[in-house]
Swiss-Prot record:
Subunit structure: Monomer.
Lipid tethering residues (S-diacylglycerol cysteine): C19
Lipidation positions, renumbered (N-palmitoyl cysteine): C19
GO biological process, one term: lipoprotein localization to outer membrane
Gene3D superfamilies, alphabetized: Lipoprotein localisation LolA/LolB/LppX (2.50.20.10)
Identification of the protein by name: Outer-membrane lipoprotein LolB
Signal peptide as annotated in the record: 1-18
Entry superkingdom: Bacteria
Organism: Haemophilus influenzae (strain PittGG)
Any Pfam family the entry gives: LolB
Task of the protein: Plays a critical role in the incorporation of lipoproteins in the outer membrane after they are released by the LolA protein.
Gene name in the database record: lolB
Length: 206
């Protein structure tokens, strides 16, 4: 199968940006009880958000990849979502589309590949081992039912630990938008696979 190495070829101009991102987890953070009334009300609110859009910037570091990109995320359900990654400098664009038969990854140069196994396709084409099906919930600050999570003193999700495919992901919610209490800056890390994502959401639509 012929692959197209998107980030190496098209996002080389963004590498220096990713190198400067602060990828360390915050320390000495205070948390409150999960039974907090304001938090429980907020949790019910975000659980009702089934489809939404988010726009912003993502920085990614792994042993083999390092990049920074603008992104647009459109989510309807676990079998229907799109992640658009693009560079304002090079005009390059990548679309990751999940559909009923699997995943399709394409770019603005006409390259396209599809596979039933979304996880393997994402690893092969982009070099990322990120569970996008879980990212849909992590992005809006909704912890999984079986996740070990903490609530911040702002009465919003502060951090969580979640096991996926035998490895452990951690998330720290650094800041929230004041107008809608939706996440603004998120730090995701997987020490097992040595992956780090820094996400900044500039706009929420739901």
């Amino acid at each position: 199968m012929k692959t197209f190495k998107f980030f190496t070829a098209l996002f080389a101009t963004a590498i220096l940006t990713a190198c400067t991102l602060d990828m360390e987890r915050p320390t000495n953070v205070q948390y409150i009880d999960k039974t907090d009334v304001i938090w429980q009300q907020h949790l019910q609110k975000i659980q009702k958000i089934q489809s939404y859009q988010a726009k912003g910037q993502i920085g990614y570091i792994s042993p083999t990849e390092r990049f920074s990109s603008r992104f647009e995320w459109q989510y309807q359900n676990p079998k229907s979502y799109t992640l658009k990654l693009y560079s304002l400098i090079s005009k390059s664009t990548l679309w990751i589309q999940m559909h009923q038969s699997g995943m399709t990854i394409s770019d603005n140069n006409g390259n396209q590949q599809s596979a039933a196994n979304a996880k393997l396709l994402l690893q092969e084409i982009i070099g990322m081992d990120v569970p996008l099906e879980h990212l849909a919930y992590w992005l809006k600050g909704q912890p999984a039912m079986n996740a070990d999570y903490q609530v911040g003193t702002n009465h919003l999700l502060g951090a969580f630990t979640y096991h996926v495919d035998g490895s452990q992901w951690t998330a720290d919610y650094l800041t929230y938008h004041s107008n809608n209490s939706m996440p603004e800056n998120i730090l995701l890390k997987n020490d097992s696979t040595k992956q780090t994502l820094k996400i900044r959401v500039d706009e929420w639509i739901y």
